Amino acid sequence: MTKVADQKLSRAGEKNFQWAKAHMGALTTLAKKYSRTKPLEGVSLGVCLHVTKETSVLIDAFLGAGAAVKLAGANPLSTQDDIAAYLSTRTEVWAWRGQSSKDYDWCIEQVLGARPTQLVDDGADLHVAAHRSRAKGIVGGSEETTTGVVRLRAMQAAGKLAYPVVAVNDARTKFLFDNRYGTGQSTLDGIMRATALLLAGMKVVVVGYGWVGKGVAMRARGMGANVSVVEVDPVKAIEAHLDGFGVSSLEEAAHWGQLFVTTTGQKNVVPYAAVEMMKEGAILANAGHFDVEIDVKTMLSKAKSVREVRPHVDEVLLPGGKKVYLVAKGRIANLVAAEGHPPEVMQMSFANQFLAAVRVHREHGSMERRVYGVSAEDEVARAALKSMGVTIGAQTKEQREYAKSWEA
C-alpha cells in the first residue's frame, strides 16, 4: 500500500508534472510513439529514482507504454512530496522527504516485495538490495548514475551480477548534458538557496574534475567565483589547468578555500583532517550521489555542537572553536536544497531510461549477465534537438563512402 507524506498535495504535484512535461519534448515524443504499441505490456517495473517533477514524466511514459510501476525514492531527503502524492494517484509509491535510513530501506523492500521483473535505479541501492535476496524473477534493469554503474561493474567483476543492466550513465546524451550542465546548474542552485551568499569573488574549491566537476566549476566561474580544482587523476588535472582553473592539492586548498564542493562519487575525498585545516566559516557541500564524500560521520562525532542556522545549513563547531558549515547534511545538495536538474536536461537522461527498459524487455533472453552500454543514442539526440527547435544536416553519400575508404 502506498505511503507518501500528504495525499492532499496531489493537485500541486500534477501542476508541477505538467510544467516538467511541457519542457521534456524528447521523452514525451518517444512516450507518444511507444504508447501506440505498448512495448512494456506485462512488465512489472521496480523503480528507485529521485521523486521529482521530471521523474513523474518518466513514470507517465512507463505507464503509457503498458508497464506496471512500483516506485521508491532514491534518497531519504530528495523526494518532492507533491510529486509523490500525485504519482500515488496513478501507481503505488513509497516515498517522502525526511526519511530515516530505516524508512529508506523499508521503501526499497516494498518495491522488491511487489516482485518486479525489471528494475530502474539511481545509485544501485535497488539492484544491490535485490541481489541480497530477491533477484529471482528479475530479467534485467538499468542504472542512471556514475556511482551506481561503478557498483554494478564491481558486482560484475566479482561474478555476482545476476542479470543484465543497461548503464544509462554511459550514454553521451546523459553524461555530457545531465552530469555537466544539469549538475553544474542545479548544484549551485541548491547551494545558493541554502546559503543565500554571493558567489562572485568567492574562493570555490571543486573536488573532482569528471563531468560533474566540470559542470560545477564552469557554472561557479560563470557566477564570478575564483575556482580551483582538486584532482588525483593527472590527466584530469591537466585538463582542469588548460581549462583555466587553478589546480592544487586538498591540503593546500583547505587553508584558503571558502566553499568546497565534492563531485567524485568516492569516499572521504574531504577527510576530517582537511576540515580541521579549513578557515573559519568554510562551507562544505556535496554533489555526489551518496553522503560519503565528505567525512561527515567523523566531523559530527568530534563536533562540540551542531545546530541548524538556515534550512539545509548546519553550523558545526569544531573542537578548536572554529565553525564550518555543512550544506544538506553532506547529501546531494542539488536535490535536497533545490529541485534537481532542469527538465530540458532530464528529457535526455530519462529518454535513455525509457528506451533501456524497452530494450531489456525485448532482448533480455539474448543478453548476458553484465553491464551494457546504451544502443539508441541517435534516436534520443534527434528527439532532443527537435524539442529544442534545432535542425542539423546529414553526411552526403560521397562523405559516407570516403569514411569507409582507406586508399588516398
Question: What function would you assign to each model-found segment?
Answer:
Residues 1-40, 71-79, 84-202:
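Glycine/serine-rich phosphate-binding loop and adjoining beta1-alpha1 elements at the start
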Residues 4-6, 15, 28, 36, ...:
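Ligand-binding pocket scaffold of soluble enzyme catalytic domains
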Residues 9-26, 42-44, 52, 163-201, ...:
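Adenosine-phosphate binding glycine-rich loop
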Residues 29-32, 63, 124-128, 133-136, ...:
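Rossmann-fold NAD(P) dinucleotide-binding segment
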Residues 49-66, 178, 182-256, 262-267:
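Glycine-rich phosphate/diphosphate-binding loop of Rossmann-like nucleotide-binding domains
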Residues 66-68, 135-137, 163, 224-225, ...:
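A short helix->loop->beta-strand "cap" motif at the edges of active sites that frequently abuts
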Residues 73, 118-123, 134-148, 266, ...:
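ADP-ribose/adenylate-binding Rossmann-like module
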